[in-house]
Swiss-Prot record:
One of its GO terms (molecular function) is toxin activity. The presence of a 'disulfide through disulfide knot' structurally defines this protein as a knottin. One of its GO terms (cellular component) is extracellular region. Expressed by the venom gland. Keywords: Disulfide bond, Knottin, Secreted, Signal, Toxin. PROSITE patterns: SPIDER_CSTX (PS60029). Its main location: secreted. Belongs to the neurotoxin 19 (CSTX) family. 01 subfamily. This is U3-lycotoxin-Ls1a. Disulfide bonds join C48-C63, C55-C72, C62-C87, C74-C85.
Length: 115
């Protein structure tokens, strides 16, 4: 019985070691591929579209604000037949950024008080 238990522990140890080595090999291959893409310049992102500018040419090109990425919002202006798309920040994300800024400022004051 002790022999079976010892054999089982050794088998599990060997299996976990071999699977960890395989994962390391996969990670190394991914890193090499990423480095080659960066060297070629293929991974470089194109320029983003600023807030309130037209994003109809590429709806995923809106810039990031401090915490969140702006969203390309499309609508029909009153009395118009053409769809207009602009990069905008949703209100709930705007409020979350304001709350985060206030919390950051308050944390700075507390740090200043208690040094």
């Amino acid at each position: 019985m002790k022999f079976v238990l010892l054999f089982g522990v050794l088998l599990v140890t060997f299996f976990s070691y071999s699977s960890a080595e395989m994962l390391d090999d996969f990670d190394q291959a991914d890193e090499d591929e990423l480095l080659s893409l960066i060297e070629k310049g293929e991974a470089r992102a194109k320029e983003c579209t600023p807030r309130f500018y037209d994003c109809s040419h590429d709806r995923h090109s809106c810039c990031r604000s401090e915490l969140f990425k702006d969203v390309c919002t499309c609508f029909y202006p009153e009395g118009g037949d053409n769809e207009v798309c602009t990069c905008q920040q949703p209100k709930h994300l705007k409020y979350m950024e304001k709350a985060a800024d206030k919390a950051k400022k308050f944390g700075g004051k507390i740090k200043k008080w208690f040094g």
